[in-house]
């Protein structure tokens, strides 16, 4: 099925020279994940984020969905949002898998950035087991383990409000939508062939990410000819929240369209 996604403006406006669409990680609300980073991009981009089904501001899903279906919805909405301006995409984890979709079929996007992600994330069996657990017990059952996986050591002590907001959003996520998102990740079946990209693609990894370690992100980058992987020191699985300034600097360097500036 085609899910309904809610898009929210995080920074800038329609007079901004470029559009940047940003995507969330599984279990997060895009405003909590990207809000501070988006504010640092204000003036150069109109930053618009989308929420996964049943997450943040998006309605709960009524049936299963796939990563390519999510990409199609985001691609189509970006055409209208861009209104002829240059448009770029950046996403984290599950949201980052869409960057690989756009590297092959970009639609309006002229560049894409995948953060803490890879063309295939984890093992299908583990995703299906997690889906079954959350259907049975709800998303609060994921809070403790996610706190351990999401953040670099010491982050929750340094930034307790940010970590708490992200984990609260996880606990409020619709259980069926979360489970279907897990199954969408289980169903990812990327090509093993090295291929060119239709638009520039950058892969970014957190140096202390235990979910998608830098070496896994680098393997994903090597799936595409000429694509490099940048590593953010001190970050775990959610760099836009853990180090908004460093993430914004990478996006500025990778995505600024000089013709539109």
Regions inferred by a protein language model and the residue ranges of each:
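Active-site loop/oxyanion-hole signature of alpha/beta-hydrolase fold enzymes
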Residues: 35-39, 46-90, 249
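Flexible "cap/lid" loop of the alpha/beta hydrolase fold
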Residues: 100-143
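Conserved HGGG/HGGXW glycine-rich cap/lid loop of the alpha/beta-hydrolase fold
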Residues: 2-60
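Conserved alpha/beta-hydrolase "acid-adjacent" motif
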Residues: 210-216
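Conserved alpha/beta-hydrolase catalytic His-Asp/Glu region
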Residues: 122-125, 137-196
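Short beta-strand/loop motif that positions the catalytic acidic residue
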Residues: 197, 203-205, 209
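Catalytic histidine-centered segment of alpha/beta-hydrolase-like enzymes
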Residues: 235-248
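Gly/Ala-rich beta-loop-alpha elbow adjacent to hydrolase catalytic centers
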Residues: 91-95, 99
